[in-house]
């Protein structure tokens, strides 16, 4: 799976890349929200990990843009933040974030959250396949015509 990282802090970005690559992910790392948005529009990412506070475009605005972007597949978004207040959490969820990881990064916590993301993405892919393969039933009778 290819993951887009948006993190302006070089040390945090390098740590994220190292952890993710060690886990076998393909990583595209960007230094701010503007670069991340451009990369997102050019590539196909099922997972985005973004810092909240960044120059150019912050993580919340990046999240909003991703949610408004027309694409065929759902993108799971994990926000990274040093802000841990309820207001910050709710604002992120309202912007469209799926999950949060707090700084400083804990590799074990990140791995656990990535496993959750993979399960949800896999479920969504399976559900999309089911929708295409199986037309809805009407009153217990298949809607296919013979």
Question: Language-model segments: which ranges?
Answer:
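Charged docking surfaces used in two-component/phosphorelay signaling
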Residues: 14-22
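Short hydrophobic/Thr-rich beta-strand motif most characteristic of the beta2 strand and flanking loop
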Residues: 24-31, 39
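Active-site beta3 strand of CheY-like receiver
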Residues: 43-49
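Receiver (REC) domain active-site loop signature in two-component systems and cognate sites
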Residues: 54
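C-terminal output helix
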Residues: 105-118
């Amino acid at each position: 799976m290819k993951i887009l990282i948006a993190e302006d802090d070089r040390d945090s970005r390098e740590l994220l890349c190292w952890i993710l690559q060690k886990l076998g992910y393909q990583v595209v790392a960007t230094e701010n929200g503007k670069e991340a948005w451009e990369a997102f529009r050019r590539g196909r990412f099922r997972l985005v990990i973004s810092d909240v506070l960044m120059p150019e475009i912050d993580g919340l605005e990046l999240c909003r843009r991703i949610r408004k972007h027309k694409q065929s597949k759902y993108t799971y978004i994990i926000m990274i933040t040093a802000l841990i207040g309820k207001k910050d959490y709710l604002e992120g969820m309202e912007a469209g974030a799926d999950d949060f990881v707090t700084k400083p990064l804990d590799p074990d916590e990140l791995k656990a959250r990535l496993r959750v993301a993979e399960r949800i993405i896999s479920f969504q892919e399976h559900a999309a396949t089911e929708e295409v393969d199986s037309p809805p039933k009407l009153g217990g009778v298949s809607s296919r015509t013979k």
